[in-house]
Amino acid sequence: MPKRKRAGAGSLSERIGFEAEVEGDDGYGGVVVGFAEQFVEPARLEPRVGNETVIASRLQGMQPFTMTVRSNERTRTITPAWQARNKRTGVVYAIKAAVNIDERNQWIELLVVQGEAG
């Protein structure tokens, strides 16, 4: 199995806005739920390929990605209740999991899915 390329500053080529779910007033006494951008971070997006689950997801119009961001005070607050938006393309990704892969608080790896409602 080939080794994955390690993330570095040069590989963080995408600008991703991370959005948390918020509630607001709809003006008629009701509540509107939506997403509001919390911060923007550079990230690396790598399509997931190969296994049976990934192939099944593609057949349903969803593409899973691994998103890598630098670990910092803000990115450590990301949860699966959030969504990510590519600032360049406008594509929205549902966040499925956030993991500190190197356990040294250098990088956070997010499993995200394009084409699925957050």
What is each residue range found by the language model?
Residues 1-31:
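Active-site-proximal polar cores
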Residues 24-25, 30-118:
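Short, conserved turn/kink motifs that form compact alpha/beta structural patches or helix kinks used as
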